[in-house]
């Protein structure tokens, strides 16, 4: 049954509540450092798969990054499912894709509005444990890249998470990271109102986050939500809205990123995967 209230007001815990629940897990388990197999490694990035009863492109994406020997990690930028009761289908499809015995890889998830609305937050945290975290990827020579994942699923980061972002980036200033990438669902900029009431942050919050990221040398911000690609340069920082990849899309893409001395990226069509 469609929860119409949730489409407008949301029925999930608000961001500060989600932060506190996630903090319990983070405090107990800490954050992850992954080992890259090469200096110039690959990250596969997708968003807005909106999994329902079909998971064709979702499973294709999983199989593709698992078979790439240069990829230690993939990132899903949110709206992994479309509506209520599809987390089981999503996870069953994920588990059904064979592992590659020759490599280790990890899927990192970002919470999207479709993932948490309609009372779905308990399901999201059941599978993904936390809505905010960072992870580090270390190359064979010891160079380290920082990926900061934060929750913007209902169009705001909240006061507690904003403070965590400040503290994390202040800590990062002292760590000599090669690159810093922020990963979230809601985008800073848009050319249309296609996503309605969940479109993006307030202007004040946009300015605060952009200033924070610029101050601490964030190289890129990856987001989804709008279902169409947009690339905006803000001084030295590149903000990318990645295309959606749901099965019904006519122009679906994922982003293939090479993390080296500079960050290169391209977009790969999966329109033929049906």
Across the structure, where does each feature detected by a protein language model lie?
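Active-site glycine-centered loops adjacent to acidic/histidine catalytic or metal-binding residues
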Residues: 48, 78-79, 112-113, 185, ...
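Extended active-site neighborhood of metal-dependent phosphoesterases/phosphodiesterases
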Residues: 8-30, 85-178, 199-200, 205-214, ...
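N-terminal active-site segment of His-dependent metallophosphoesterases
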Residues: 8-88
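Short, solvent-exposed aromatic-acidic interface loops
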Residues: 267-274
């Amino acid at each position: 049954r469609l929860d119409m209230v949730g489409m407008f007001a949301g029925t999930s815990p608000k961001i500060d509540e989600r932060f506190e629940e996630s903090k319990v897990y983070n405090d107990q388990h800490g954050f992850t450092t992954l080992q890259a197999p090469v200096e110039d490694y690959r990250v596969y990035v997708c968003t807005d798969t909106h999994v329902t009863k079909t998971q064709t492109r979702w499973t294709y994406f999983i199989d593709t990054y698992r078979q790439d020997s240069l990829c230690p990690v993939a990132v899903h930028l949110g709206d992994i499912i479309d509506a209520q009761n599809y987390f089981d289908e999503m996870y069953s499809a994920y588990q059904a894709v064979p592992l590659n015995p020759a490599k280790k890889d990890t899927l990192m998830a970002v919470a999207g509005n479709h993932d948490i609305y309609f009372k779905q937050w308990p399901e999201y945290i059941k599978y993904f444990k936390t809505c905010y975290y960072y992870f580090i990827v270390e190359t064979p020579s010891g160079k380290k890249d920082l990926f900061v994942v934060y929750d913007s699923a209902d169009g705001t980061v909240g006061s507690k998470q904003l403070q965590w972002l400040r503290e994390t980036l202040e800590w990062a200033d002292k760590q000599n990271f090669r690159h810093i990438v922020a990963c979230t669902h809601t985008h800073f900029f848009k050319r249309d109102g296609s996503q309605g009431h969940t479109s993006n942050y307030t202007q004040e919050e946009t300015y605060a986050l952009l200033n924070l990221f610029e101050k601490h040398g964030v190289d890129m911000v990856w987001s989804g939500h709008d279902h169409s690609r947009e690339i905006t340069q803000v001084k030295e920082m590149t903000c990318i809205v990645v295309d959606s990849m749901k099965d019904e899309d006519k122009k679906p893409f994922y982003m293939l990123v090479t993390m080296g001395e500079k960050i290169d990226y391209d977009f790969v069509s999966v329109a033929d995967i049906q």
